[in-house]
């Protein structure tokens, strides 16, 4: 126990030094981490969302060097799931070609192939991060935190650099009154900021009270409703599970009351404005139900080639259902999702739902197993900060994060797994 505390104190002092060492010891991973917060660069003109972040271009060379130095290790179960999804993808390709005769078969093949590449790169980012040692992953986390903090300062000091089209931003920002950083939009940046705060809390071993207080304040300041509300849900969820029954009830009630007050005074007006003026509430709500419905009707997934056609097929019925109960919502945007051939903004707005649609139970079963296993490890290690970070990642990717051009989530998951394994090994020793 004493050794564990000493190592934590020592690691606080050496994380910054390890960033410099990382540059010379593992330059590809250094660059990979450095560019993770940049997920909307002009590199999109090369390969679309897949090359939105410079990290995507560094990923394959970095992985190649890592394999040469450490060898190749692949889980057979993951390979079986991968080929199973590919088989289902091709079967659904022929199904949707006949079901939607107005859809060009080349279009389905083209879009499905693009989704395939996007997810391959996304999971390779996770695999590459998992291959790092404890010092390098900690140094990478510290580097990402520094870049995100710098982007916040730049957003205030010279917002024109952030909001206007340039080499670091593929397009102009339509909401310059909000924070954007180096990311695609305010909601993604809010996710980056909260994840960075939680990463910092894990690295520095913050107290729970300090973590919750700082994160709530910063989450509100990010102007991202999704990030702030997801963290509030994390708090309520966490305290509803911990301690004795009366303690859990008391903390849960306090969390709910505080969350309600924050929601009422900081987010209710903005949410009402969204409902009256924009279509985001109707779009996100509709597509959340669409994603669940597609999964229930296709538990094995629809594969990469069935993703868009299944959305075309299921969305109109869900719109009619929601509209009958909430006619005041604006469905203009989500109506375009029913038009065969539309693809630019079509999606569930939830990475987890997208994975359920494409992979079905091939994703759901390993996902549930992983969550249960690692949360138990965090409990055994008394790592509340890691617990909060994982919960925030889950809720955010469930409700408002779906950007496959960003590798923030794969890195954070790898960071938590590597730290958990390292703690377990230290406890055994």
From Swiss-Prot:
Disulphide-bonded residues: none
Location (main, coarse): membrane
Keywords: Cell membrane, Membrane, Transmembrane, Transmembrane helix, Transport
Subcellular location: Cell membrane
Keyword set includes Endoplasmic reticulum: no
Cellular component per GO, a single term: plasma membrane
Domain of life: Bacteria
Bilayer topology: Multi-pass membrane protein
Transmembrane spans: 27-47, 48-68, 78-98, 106-126, 142-162, 198-218, 219-239, 249-269, 288-308, 351-371, 399-419
UniProt function note: May function as a transporter.
Protein name: Uncharacterized 49.5 kDa protein in cps region
Protein species of origin: Klebsiella pneumoniae
């Amino acid at each position: 126990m004493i050794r564990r505390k000493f190592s934590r104190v020592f690691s606080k002092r050496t994380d910054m030094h390890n960033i410099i060492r990382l540059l010379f010891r593992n330059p590809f991973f250094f660059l990979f981490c450095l560019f993770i917060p940049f997920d909307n660069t002009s590199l999109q003109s090369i390969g679309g969302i897949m090359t939105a972040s410079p990290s995507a271009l560094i990923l394959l060379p970095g992985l190649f060097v890592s394999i040469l130095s450490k060898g190749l290790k692949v889980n057979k179960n993951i390979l079986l799931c991968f080929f199973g999804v590919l088989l289902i993808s091709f079967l659904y390709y022929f199904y949707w070609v006949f079901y939607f005769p107005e859809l060009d078969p080349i279009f389905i093949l083209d879009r499905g192939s693009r989704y395939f590449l996007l997810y391959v790169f996304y999971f390779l980012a996770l695999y590459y991060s998992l291959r790092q040692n404890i010092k390098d992953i900690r140094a990478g986390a510290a580097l990402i935190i520094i870049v995100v903090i710098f982007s916040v300062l730049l957003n205030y000091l010279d917002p024109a650099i952030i909001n206007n089209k340039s080499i670091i931003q593929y397009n102009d920002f339509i909401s310059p009154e909000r924070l954007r950083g180096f990311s695609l939009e305010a909601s993604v940046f809010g996710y980056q900021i909260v994840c960075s705060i939680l990463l910092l809390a894990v690295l520095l071993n913050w107290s729970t009270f300090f973590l919750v207080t700082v994160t709530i304040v910063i989450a509100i300041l990010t102007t991202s409703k999704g990030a702030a509300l997801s963290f509030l849900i994390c708090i309520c969820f966490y305290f509803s599970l911990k301690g004795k029954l009366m303690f859990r009830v008391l903390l849960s009630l306090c969390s709910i009351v505080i969350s309600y007050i924050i929601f009422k005074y900081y987010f209710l007006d903005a949410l009402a404005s969204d409902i009256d003026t924009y279509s985001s509430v109707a779009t996100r709500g509709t597509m959340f139900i669409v994603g669940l419905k597609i999964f229930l009707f296709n538990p094995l997934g629809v594969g990469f080639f069935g993703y868009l056609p299944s959305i075309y097929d299921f969305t109109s019925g869900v719109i009619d259902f929601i509209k009958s109960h909430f006619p005041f919502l604006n469905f203009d945007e989500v109506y375009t999702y029913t038009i065969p051939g539309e693809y630019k903004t079509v999606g569930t707005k939830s990475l987890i739902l997208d994975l359920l649609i494409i992979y079905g139970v091939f994703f759901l079963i390993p996902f549930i197993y992983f969550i249960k296993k690692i949360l138990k490890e965090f409990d055994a290690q008394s790592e509340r900060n890691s617990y909060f970070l994982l919960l925030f990642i889950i809720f955010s990717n469930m409700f408002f994060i779906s950007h496959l051009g960003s590798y923030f989530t794969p890195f954070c998951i790898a960071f938590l797994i590597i730290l958990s394994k390292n703690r377990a090994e230290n406890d055994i020793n």
